[in-house]
């Protein structure tokens, strides 16, 4: 069935969950609002949203160095209190995120950070390809929307499939951790370094090496 914007907005008001999460929840539950709320709660998304407005100014800068020193990552993850910043679960989360960044090579933390000019360029490429199919404009726009969401999932950390559990996104992993720890958390920024990046060298699959080192 078709999910309307009004349904999505209503679910967002109730749960405070993200737009795409609400849309997916309604799709999975055939538009049943009550079931969609339960769906989000089971995923940890609704519970996390209740904490989202609280300031997260403590935290830690974590690091990950790939075996052999070929890839290095620094990532800043914020939480509300210094007590939680020293918590083993929080520290494990920071380490897992740093390892994920090393393996998946995201370019941005979230979709809002993607430059408008880059996004528009991608849309034009997708639009040109879609028009070659001869489909109506309304169908073409839906195709473009789907392609852009895939693009976000490739380059935005929070929308990537988590390398240690590909059945969930990094955002879902974050939400689950927020629910278990009981404090708001946020991945603020990261930097990823590759040995010899920009220099002419023999190609190798660093992502596969990182995954292998993590036992994935």
Curated annotation (Swiss-Prot):
Its main location: cytoplasm. Pfam families: EF_TS. CDD domains: UBA_EF-Ts. GO terms for molecular function: translation elongation factor activity. Residues 81-84 are annotated as: Involved in Mg(2+) ion dislocation from EF-Tu. The keyword Nucleus does not apply. It comes from the Bacteria. It is found in: Cytoplasm. GO terms for biological process: translational elongation. Keywords: Cytoplasm, Elongation factor, Protein biosynthesis. GO terms for cellular component: cytoplasm. Disulfide bonds: none annotated. Belongs to the EF-Ts family. Associates with the EF-Tu.GDP complex and induces the exchange of GDP to GTP. It remains bound to the aminoacyl-tRNA.EF-Tu.GTP complex up to the GTP hydrolysis stage on the ribosome. This is Elongation factor Ts. It comes from Geobacter sulfurreducens (strain ATCC 51573 / DSM 12127 / PCA).
């Amino acid at each position: 069935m078709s999910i309307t914007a009004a349904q999505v907005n209503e679910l967002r008001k109730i749960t405070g969950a993200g737009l795409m999460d609400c849309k997916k929840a309604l799709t999975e539950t055939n538009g049943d609002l009550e079931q969609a709320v339960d769906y989000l709660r089971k995923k940890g998304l609704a519970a996390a949203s209740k904490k989202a407005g609280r300031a997260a100014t403590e935290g830690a800068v974590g690091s990950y160095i790939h075996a052999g020193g070929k890839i290095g990552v620094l990532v800043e993850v914020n939480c509300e209190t210094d007590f939680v910043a020293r918590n083993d679960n929080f520290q494990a989360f920071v380490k897992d995120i740093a390892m994920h960044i090393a393996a998946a090579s995201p370019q941005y933390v979230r979709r809002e950070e993607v430059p408008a000019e880059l996004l528009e360029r991608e849309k034009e490429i997708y639009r040109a390809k879609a028009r070659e199919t001869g489909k109506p404009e309304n169908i073409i726009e839906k195709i473009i929307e789907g392609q852009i969401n895939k693009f976000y999932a490739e380059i935005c950390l929070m929308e990537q499939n988590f390398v240690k559990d590909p059945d969930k996104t990094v955002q879902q992993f974050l939400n689950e951790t927020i629910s278990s720890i009981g404090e708001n958390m946020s991945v603020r920024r990261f930097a990823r370094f590759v040995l010899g990046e920009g220099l002419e060298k023999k190609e190798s699959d660093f992502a596969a090496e990182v995954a292998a080192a993590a036992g994935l």
